[in-house]
């Protein structure tokens, strides 16, 4: 992974977890060829293991194929919640949890 290609390493993205794509606002340009062009996605893999889906791929420079960052996205269902995580030097780090129930018990306000 290349620290010279990104503005900030692993920026906090809150609950924005990307299964695909690139966070171009954090891309300053390729440290190898000094071009700021589109970022390619390469070597994308999807693995389903023990109720967990893991997607990994490489962000690469369009011009010289320099590896900018490795992206990892995970999806699991734990109890009544869908759990998402993302970890990537370019796209950042994020976590999200969404209830699979019609009404999220965590959002229920106490009556008294």
From Swiss-Prot:
Gene3D superfamilies: Transcription activator, Churchill. It comes from the Eukaryota. Pfam families: Churchill (PF06573). The keyword Transmembrane helix does not apply. Zn(2+) 3 binds at residues 59, 71, 88, 91. Zn(2+) 1 binds at residues 2, 5, 30, 66. InterPro entries: Churchill_sf, Transcrpt_activator_Churchill. Zn(2+) 2 binds at residues 30, 33, 61, 64. Keywords: Activator, Developmental protein, Metal-binding, Transcription, Transcription regulation, Zinc. One of its GO terms (molecular function) is zinc ion binding. GO terms for biological process: cell migration involved in gastrulation; fibroblast growth factor receptor signaling pathway; fibroblast growth factor receptor signaling pathway involved in somitogenesis; negative regulation of cell migration; negative regulation of fibroblast growth factor receptor signaling pathway; positive regulation of DNA-templated transcription; regulation of cell migration; regulation of mesodermal cell fate specification. The keyword Magnesium does not apply. Induction: Up-regulated by FGF signaling in embryos at mid-gastrulation. Belongs to the Churchill family. Transcriptional activator that mediates FGF signaling during neural development. Plays a role in the regulation of cell movement. Does not bind DNA by itself. This is Protein Churchill. The lineage of its organism: Eukaryota, Metazoa, Chordata, Craniata, Vertebrata.
């Amino acid at each position: 992974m290349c620290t010279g290609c990104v503005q900030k390493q692993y920026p906090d993205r809150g609950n924005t977890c990307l299964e695909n794509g690139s966070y171009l606002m954090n891309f300053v340009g390729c440290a190898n060829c000094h071009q700021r062009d589109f970022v390619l996605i390469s070597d994308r893999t999807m693995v389903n293991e023990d109720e967990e889906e893991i997607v990994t791929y490489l962000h690469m420079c369009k011009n010289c194929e320099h590896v900018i960052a490795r992206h990892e996205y995970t999806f699991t269902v734990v109890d009544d919640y869908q759990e998402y995580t993302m970890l990537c030097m370019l796209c950042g780090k994020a976590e999200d949890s969404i209830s699979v129930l019609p009404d999220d018990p965590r959002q229920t306000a106490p009556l008294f």
